[in-house]
Amino acid sequence: MSRTNFDTLLEAGCHFGHLKRKWNPSMAPYIFMERNGIHIIDLNKTVAKVDEAADALKQIAKSGKKVLFVATKKQAKQVVAEKAASVNMPYVIERWPGGMLTNFPTIRKAVKKMATIDKLTNDGTYSNLSKREVLQISRQRAKLEKNLGSIADLTRLPSALFVIDVLKENIAVREANRLGIPVFAIVDTNSDPSNVDFVIPANDDATKSVEVILDACCGAIAEGLEERKAEKVDMEAAGENAPKGAGKKKNTKARMDKAEEEAINAAKAAAFLKEDEEA
């Protein structure tokens, strides 16, 4: 069963593309028709592509990996922040920090700096500083929070990137391509889909359009997280139900095997020395 449907996408305005003169020929397979100089996206293909992307995102979440959402355009920022946060995924809605992926260690240092400032604030270290110094540090902390606060929990490179508007976020897409990180994206008729692994052809300028697609994709991520949680509970239960002493017996057997191997090796060494003496 599909995670979305034609009518839902139609009502959200997902079918509206850009003016014909602004189109990217690579998007031709996803265009249904032209009306009043505007390209209309084939929503049947959008439904199929949403399902394809959602299934892949579910597996990524189920494996315990992170998906980084990227949307710095005004129409998408708020909805992306809400949807990504709802499934505990990192997101970037302010200016994309150049080198965020290709120079990830430097970004992590900035995040750690933010944590250090918090620690020094809590332990009273700043009580010995002047008001001016405290103000400077506070401003620095606020700037770091604005740009990097939403990725504070991203301790390693994400396993995928989900982008709203690949034309605007071309630097992020380029960095992901360079590192071999899969790119999921809502791609409008004016954009190039060639650098995107999972293309979702749809209107990327309307908040409602972005929202309905994120509902389906984040719903799949939530399912993956739930399945991972259930599997973990089952594994823990299986461990508790294992016969008492099973682990101990296994360790004892391992020690016995090792002792036996050492005894055999010692016997071989003794035999070798004896042969050497007789010679």
Predicted regions mapped to residue ranges:
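Intrinsically disordered, compositionally biased charged tails
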Residues: 1-3, 226-279
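Ribosome large-subunit tunnel/peptidyl-transferase-proximal elements
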Residues: 1-233
